[in-house]
């Protein structure tokens, strides 16, 4: 039991630094924005109260969304609220782009939600887009003062305050999820961007390519076959919620499905991202691809430039270590406990006397190489019955001597003299089992 307690204590202590680091980092990043977050929460709560008038059936008509959010959402009482909030956020993105059509001929891939850590180690998020095909406009979603938006655009015509509030609420939580890597690694710096985690799998006759922490703008994911773009059979976009340290963080996950056949084994899943790097505001295209069957685990993280943030490494136990901690060590500790308890009971049941036959046998076994047979003589006055047979059975066990116990006294006699010994001629000898 002590071993189990020590193992559990070691496991808790080993993971404590990483947990403290995550909570401290979140507290610092969110604490600096606490006032603004309170305002945005009021806006979002107002949207949640309107949910009774907006059912899932008329979301497409009201929200004008192109995304299908009917995928696998987190189960729980707040899943419907998350689903609705996802529709609201995507609708406001579309509302922004609808207004941008008046000043820009570009599509979604020239706009970007940029998350980064500035020189003061403060979390920042900006919405950057190309206006009139010549000018980049950057909107700081963490700053309530919008007066610095570029003069070339009449912002009031399409950038409504409600949209900016909702996008600010989303961006703040998305950027925390985007920058804080729960394994102790942060990607920012020159690129200020962490690419989505991409993996593929087979699923009931389909090849599914999934981009986790996917951004709905600035990124394009598609199937490719022999360097040619291939349309997908089905696309699913999920609005994912993560809760840590009491804060809700949001991100997207997009999945492409393609019917699988023997002739289409060369399918690859490609992601292209047109990154608008701030403050230089230079367009740079980062692209990568991987085969669907080669290594379907997070290949994107090894493709884009990455920067490591000094953070404690959280120890992870492998299956063998978990087997020892939760199965082998508890069983061994339990067996040891039962053994000690049994010996303890035997000692007190036997009375602890050195003249006890069992204790005599233990001493003799420890000193003699040949096992000793204990012969108990009850009261030393019984008449022997079938005396020769008793002695014959003794001779089969030991060749030189036997142990005789009479009352509180024990002694050894030679087998050769036992027949002629007068004091034992009228004694019944009973063999005790070893």
Swiss-Prot record:
Keywords: Glycoprotein, Host endoplasmic reticulum, Host lysosome, Host membrane, Host-virus interaction, Inhibition of host innate immune response by virus, Membrane, Signal, Transmembrane, Transmembrane helix, Viral immunoevasion
Pfam families: C1-set (PF07654)
Membrane topology: Single-pass membrane protein
Keyword Transferase: no
Compartments (UniProt record): Host endoplasmic reticulum membrane; Host lysosome membrane
Main location (coarse class): host cell
InterPro entries: Ig-like_dom_sf (IPR036179), Ig-like_fold (IPR013783), Ig_C1-set (IPR003597)
Annotated SUPFAM superfamilies: Immunoglobulin (SSF48726)
A cellular-component GO term for this protein: host cell lysosomal membrane
Cleaved signal peptide residues: 1-15
Superkingdom of origin: Viruses
Membrane-spanning parts: 322-342
GO biological process: symbiont-mediated suppression of host innate immune response
Main function: Plays a role in the down-regulation of the host stress-induced NKG2D ligand UBPL1, which enables immune cells expressing the NKG2D receptor to recognize and annihilate infected cells prior to viral spread.
Protein name: Glycoprotein U20
Species of origin: Human herpesvirus 6B (strain Z29) (HHV-6 variant B)
Upper classification of the organism: Viruses, Duplodnaviria, Heunggongvirae, Peploviricota, Herviviricetes
Gene: U20
